[in-house]
Amino acid sequence: MYIRYKNSSKFRRYSRLYRFTTFAYQKNKKAGVALRYHFNQGLGVFVLPYKNGHVITEIAHAYDMSDYLNDNRRTSYARSGIYWDNDTQYFSSKLEFEYFYQISEIVEQNLSRTQIMSEIIIPIKNGVSASLIYETENYRKLNNNPNSISLSIGWKGNLKWSF
């Protein structure tokens, strides 16, 4: 299970720059993650915007809280990444390379890691799409380098709520 929310906004004077906040919850026993809460916040730059997509880079402060509810222990990271999004007439694709450098010493193990994700998104109808995703994590100091393949159904649109 993977739930992710990202909010971003461009700077008015510098439209190639944006700020973002991301929250994610992940459960993947096959990859050794019983439950991970993830948060990051930072700045991004549109390095190469083009008609059907873009290449961006981001820097951020991030933290994880894994496998312990109602606790304030967390692992902090400096995060950087480069991302390529491309749209075609029939599908969209994403390729992401992220590096997390552990800056906290609360957790005894060094959890610095590289994460690579590729995704193909095929639109179905009315904002509904199918996504095929491959992810891998390579830890610097651990022998556990999990990877996973998943298929998901997504919906993109506005909620029509009124208050």
What feature does the model see in each segment?
Residues 3-7, 41, 78-82, 116-118, ...:
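Membrane-embedded beta-strands of outer-membrane beta-barrel proteins
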Residues 10-17, 31, 48-56, 87-93, ...:
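Short loop/turn motifs that connect adjacent beta-strands in outer-membrane beta-barrel proteins
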Residues 1-3, 33-39, 72-78, 110-114, ...:
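Residues that define the transmembrane beta-barrel architecture of outer-membrane proteins
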Residues 147-163:
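Outer-membrane beta-barrel "beta-signal"
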Residues 10-12, 24-32, 46-48, 62-70, ...:
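Sequence/structural signature of outer-membrane beta-barrel proteins
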Residues 39-41, 61:
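Hydrophobic alpha-helical segments of small multi-pass membrane proteins
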Residues 1-27:
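Glycine- and aromatic-enriched membrane insertion/assembly motifs of diderm outer-membrane
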Residues 52-129:
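Outer-membrane beta-barrel transmembrane domain signature
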